[in-house]
Amino acid sequence: MCSNEKARDWHRADVIAGLKKRKLSLSALSRQFGYAPTTLANALERHWPKGEQIIANALETKPEVIWPSRYQAGE
């Protein structure tokens, strides 16, 4: 990737599809961690480090890979 190209965040459908491939869902993950079923969906729309980490762990990656715009250096 060139330095002037911006990394793109995963589309929310890609995050959900990745979870489905692992036989998971956002609501199941939310309940597993003691949240209301819709709570982790907030991480798809806005920066919430704890929720992003839960989702990233389930997808076996890092939050900055899924949401690079939220973790850009110097911001």
UniProtKB/Swiss-Prot annotation:
One of the Pfam families matching this protein, by short name: HTH_35
Induction line: Expressed in the early phase of the viral replicative cycle. Early gene transcription is repressed by viral Repc (latency) and favored by viral Ner protein (lytic development).
Major site of localization recorded for this protein: host cell
Keyword Transport among UniProt keywords: no
Keyword vocabulary terms for this entry: DNA-binding, Early protein, Host cytoplasm, Pyruvate, Repressor, Transcription, Transcription regulation
Cell location: Host cytoplasm
An annotated Gene Ontology molecular function: DNA binding
Any one GO cellular component localisation term in the record: transcription repressor complex
Residues modified as N-pyruvate 2-iminyl-cysteine: C2
InterPro entries linked to this entry: Lambda_DNA-bd_dom_sf (IPR010982), Ner_HTH_dom (IPR038722)
DNA-binding region, residues: 26-45
Protein's job: Switches off the PcM promoter thereby blocking expression of the major repressor Repc (latency factor) and favoring transcription from the early promoter (Pe) and hence viral transposition and lytic development. Negatively regulates the early promoter (Pe) thereby controlling its own expression and keeping the level of early genes expression independent of the viral genome copy number.
Family: Belongs to the ner transcriptional regulatory family.
Protein name as catalogued: Negative regulator of transcription
Species this protein is from: Escherichia phage Mu (Bacteriophage Mu)
Protein's gene: ner
